[in-house]
């Protein structure tokens, strides 16, 4: 599920941290499956996860200001 910045800005800091950790975990799973020689379940999934992580980090930085 894609999360847009607007939805992320409405989340609390704790929710953002939870979302970030779950995204990093799913990216790790995708990378490990590819490293073991398997084909990725969806070729664009890793890119999508990386972008979602970037969105979460951006919103977290915005909230610090």
From Swiss-Prot:
InterPro entries: Ribosomal_protein_uL29 (IPR050063), Ribosomal_uL29 (IPR001854), Ribosomal_uL29_CS (IPR018254), Ribosomal_uL29_sf (IPR036049)
Single GO MF descriptor: structural constituent of ribosome
Residue spans crossing the bilayer: none
Keyword Ribonucleoprotein: yes
GO biological process: translation
Alphabetically ordered keywords of this record: Ribonucleoprotein, Ribosomal protein
Name of the protein this chain belongs to: Large ribosomal subunit protein uL29
Native source organism of the sequence: Picrophilus torridus (strain ATCC 700027 / DSM 9790 / JCM 10055 / NBRC 100828 / KAW 2/3)
Species classification: Archaea, Methanobacteriati, Thermoplasmatota, Thermoplasmata, Thermoplasmatales
Gene name per UniProt: rpl29
């Amino acid at each position: 599920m894609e999360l847009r910045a607007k939805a992320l800005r409405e989340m609390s800091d704790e929710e953002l941290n939870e979302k970030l950790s779950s995204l990093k975990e799913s990216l790790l799973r995708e990378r490990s499956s590819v490293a073991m020689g398997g084909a990725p379940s969806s070729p664009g999934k890793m890119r999508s996860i990386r972008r979602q992580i970037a969105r979460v980090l951006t919103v977290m930085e915005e909230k610090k200001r």
